[in-house]
Amino acid sequence: MGLPWYRVHTVVLNDPGRLLSVHIMHTALVAGWAGSMALYELAVFDPSDPVLDPMWRQGMFVIPFMTRLGITNSWGGWNITGGTITNPGLWSYEGVAGAHIVFSGLCFLAAIWHWVYWDLEIFCDERTGKPSLDLPKIFGIHLFLSGVACFGFGAFHVTGLYGPGIWVSDPYGLTGKVQPVNPAWGVEGFDPFVPGGIASHHIAAGTLGILAGLFHLSVRPPQRLYKGLRMGNIETVLSSSIAAVFFAAFVVAGTMWYGSATTPIELFGPTRYQWDQGYFQQEIYRRVSAGLAENPSLSEVWSKIPEKLAFYDYIGNNPAKGGLFRAGSMDNGDGIAVGWLGHPVFRNKEGRELFVRRMPTFFETFPVVLVDGDGIVRADVPFRRAESKYSVEQVGVTVEFYGGELNGVSYSDPATVKKYARRAQLGEIFELDRATLKSDGVFRSSPRGWFTFGHASFALLFFFGHIWHGARTLFRDVFAGIDPDLDAQVEFGAFQKLGDPTTKRQAV
């Protein structure tokens, strides 16, 4: 059969056995990819520094998804939080990967079996003796089973009733761990950052799915609706399935990019909006202000700022800084973070504290400008020295570090001050190892950026697929040139023109 590549799927249009086979094979491919990718990531993942070299800096894609569902241990003896363990149990990262690969193999064999034994009695319509599928009934079965799975996940896995719970953290991504979550049945359950909403929404949606499934199993669709929506046509199923998938893809692209309880920053990295709004910077200053009320020593107060919090406040961790087509992990870009140098405080010769204006997300270069507490420009690194009035040399800017590796160290040399002012544009200053991975110094995006781009792109593609196949199934007769009200048998190709009133007719 000489079908063009874009028409090959028509071979399963009227072949329920082989339609089932290709879907099982698709599941085998998906599960096989997931398991294989997990094993690859585990082979290259370095769990030694969860603070400065977390999974998202290393470009891990499937490990974060396993972790958010409660997997934290490895058969290699390490824990995702940096500890060591002696008994990881079956459901470790490797255990989950292996389960996917075994499942993939079983699906592969099942797909082959169903391809060979395609002509099963179950697919045969006893009235006509031809292969057919009761699509509304199948819809009810799938809705019921997915409802059971959805309810079970929310009621048992997430709540810890029978399962580990999910990854839960504080708003600043510092204290994350896997724990049971109680359903949030109040209005707070609609807050996308409240983990309890995950449990309650799965329980509610699962209950609805179970009831809807039972309804579709026990109630047949009216004939007019059945015909109007082409419920007997498999392409209707394809069209509506694509709609469900692209809708879900758009939703998860949003929850990933803008952030939610389902996409913790400890697993996927911070969002770009946290940089844009100075989210972590505000929390750091709040902690410093609170600390100064009890202890007047800036060094001691800044030394208590968690290195993890300081690291979030660095532009290199902003997923919007890396180009979409720059391959590689964040570590391949600006390097592996080794340590926090400390917080630089700039002052002019009058002792006034100055703040470096931070680089906005979509700038590659940005002028070095230092402002005072009122936002008035007091110093800069000029483009043209001849016209400068606020240069570091003229204003006499110095820098002193508090906290971190350079705690208590100060510099007055203009070249050194300018170096740290440039680096302060990018947030908190870190020592970065670019030699180990031969990092090129060009920022990369995090898995948060890749996931969003991939799902938004495929959602758009699938949206057009839904329109295409929906139109094909709704207007199939029109596209084929057949009048839906035709009551006469016409021999196609034998007459001059289809629909010509002079054409001979033969009663059906």
Curated annotation (Swiss-Prot):
The membrane-spanning stretches of this chain are 21-36, 101-115, 140-156, 203-218, 237-252, 457-472
In terms of superkingdom, the source organism counts as: Eukaryota
Entry's Gene Ontology molecular function annotations? chlorophyll binding; electron transporter, transferring electrons within the cyclic electron transport pathway of photosynthesis activity
Q: Where in the cell is it found?
A: Plastid, Chloroplast thylakoid membrane
Give UniProt keywords alphabetically: Chlorophyll, Chloroplast, Chromophore, Membrane, Photosynthesis, Photosystem II, Plastid, Thylakoid, Transmembrane, Transmembrane helix
How are cofactors bound according to the entry's free-text note? Binds multiple chlorophylls. PSII binds additional chlorophylls, carotenoids and specific lipids.
Query: Which SUPFAM superfamilies does this one have?
Result: Photosystem II antenna protein-like
In what way does this protein cross or attach to the membrane?
Answer: Multi-pass membrane protein
Gene3D superfamilies in alphabetical order: Photosystem II CP47 reaction center protein
One GO BP annotation here? Answer: photosynthetic electron transport in photosystem II
Name the predominant localization.
plastid
Annotated Gene Ontology cellular component terms: chloroplast thylakoid membrane; photosystem II
* Subunit structure as annotated in this protein's UniProt entry: PSII is composed of 1 copy each of membrane proteins PsbA, PsbB, PsbC, PsbD, PsbE, PsbF, PsbH, PsbI, PsbJ, PsbK, PsbL, PsbM, PsbT, PsbX, PsbY, PsbZ, Psb30/Ycf12, at least 3 peripheral proteins of the oxygen-evolving complex and a large number of cofactors. It forms dimeric complexes.
Known function: One of the components of the core complex of photosystem II (PSII). It binds chlorophyll and helps catalyze the primary light-induced photochemical processes of PSII. PSII is a light-driven water:plastoquinone oxidoreductase, using light energy to abstract electrons from H(2)O, generating O(2) and a proton gradient subsequently used for ATP formation.
Q: Which family does it belong to?
A: Belongs to the PsbB/PsbC family. PsbB subfamily.
Q: Which HAMAP family match?
A: PSII_PsbB_CP47
PANTHER family according to UniProt? PHOTOSYSTEM II CP43 REACTION CENTER PROTEIN (PTHR33180:SF37)
This protein's name: Photosystem II CP47 reaction center protein
